[in-house]
């Protein structure tokens, strides 16, 4: 059974924070070679604080995917380290949240749910459902070209607000991720092409997907 739910930084058990930060080092340092700070095998930064909410995707209490949310009224990566990469951009603030540190732990996902799991799409849907449940207007994020392509293929309604170049001289995109009915339904339809799940269970928050493991 796959469960997706949200937890605030202040309410996160220490062992779960360690688990997230360890998985983030594997993803963002070891696999993607981002310029991130890692200490004792864990990746975290100044944006992991009381203003942060995490979506966790767990199978048998093991984290297999996660994403970080911060309300745009607080300091974010978009208004902080990413700001120099984009020019002449007017950001929507009121009612918007930033997403960052999106990951699916590929080895764990492959071992637990198989190669054709649509786990990324399920996490995309979780982001939409969470934002809708909390009354937000939309999600802002900065992504690489690879992630941009993955998002477009998912059927999610996304808008490019700006385009820049990272410190690695790679194209990056500042995106508005829609949380409209069509985005939700497109993501649900893609999941249903792979998994036999009652559609109504995918419209809720939190999300529980039974029978997804191998």
From Swiss-Prot:
Coiled-coil regions listed: none
Pfam families: Autoind_synth (PF00765)
Key word Metal-binding present: no
Keywords assigned: Autoinducer synthesis, Quorum sensing, S-adenosyl-L-methionine, Transferase
Keyword Transferase (UniProt): yes
GO BP annotations listed: quorum sensing; signal transduction
MF GO annotations: N-acyl homoserine lactone synthase activity
UniProt-listed Enzyme Commission number(s): 2.3.1.184
Tree of life domain: Bacteria
PROSITE patterns attached to this UniProt entry: AUTOINDUCER_SYNTH_1, AUTOINDUCER_SYNTH_2
Substrates-to-products reaction catalysed: a fatty acyl-[ACP] + S-adenosyl-L-methionine = an N-acyl-L-homoserine lactone + S-methyl-5'-thioadenosine + holo-[ACP] + H(+)
InterPro entries on file: Acyl_CoA_acyltransferase (IPR016181), Autoind_synth_CS (IPR018311), Autoind_synthase (IPR001690)
Family affiliation: Belongs to the autoinducer synthase family.
PANTHER family reported in the protein's UniProt record: ACYL-HOMOSERINE-LACTONE SYNTHASE, ISOVALERYL-HOMOSERINE LACTONE SYNTHASE
Role this protein plays: Required for the synthesis of autoinducer molecules such as OHHL (N-(3-oxohexanoyl)-L-homoserine lactone), and HHL (N-hexanoyl-L-homoserine lactone).
Protein name according to UniProt: Acyl-homoserine-lactone synthase
Phylogenetic classification of the source organism: Bacteria, Pseudomonadati, Pseudomonadota, Gammaproteobacteria, Enterobacterales
């Amino acid at each position: 059974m796959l469960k997706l739910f949200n937890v605030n930084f202040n309410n996160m058990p220490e062992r779960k924070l360690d688990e997230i930060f360890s998985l983030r080092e594997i993803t963002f340092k070891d696999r993607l070679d981002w310029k991130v700070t890692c200490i004792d095998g864990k990746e975290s930064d100044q944006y992991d604080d009381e203003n942060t909410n995490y979506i966790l995707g767990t199978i048998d209490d093991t984290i297999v995917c996660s994403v970080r949310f911060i309300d745009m009224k607080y300091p974010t990566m978009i208004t902080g380290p990413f700001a120099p990469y984009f020019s002449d951009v007017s950001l929507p603030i009121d009612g918007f949240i930033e997403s960052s540190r999106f990951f699916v732990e590929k080895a764990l996902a492959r071992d637990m749910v198989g190669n054709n799991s649509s786990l990324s799409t399920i996490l995309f849907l979780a982001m939409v459902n969470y934002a809708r449940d909390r009354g937000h207007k939309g999600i802002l994020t900065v992504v690489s070209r690879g992630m941009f392509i993955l998002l477009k293929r998912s059927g999610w309604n996304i808008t490019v607000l700006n385009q820049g170049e990272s410190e690695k001289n790679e194209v990056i995109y500042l995106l508005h991720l829609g949380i409209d009915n069509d985005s939700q339904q497109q993501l649900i339809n893609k999941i249903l092409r792979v998994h036999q799940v009652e559609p109504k269970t995918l419209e809720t928050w939190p999300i529980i997907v039974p029978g997804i493991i191998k």
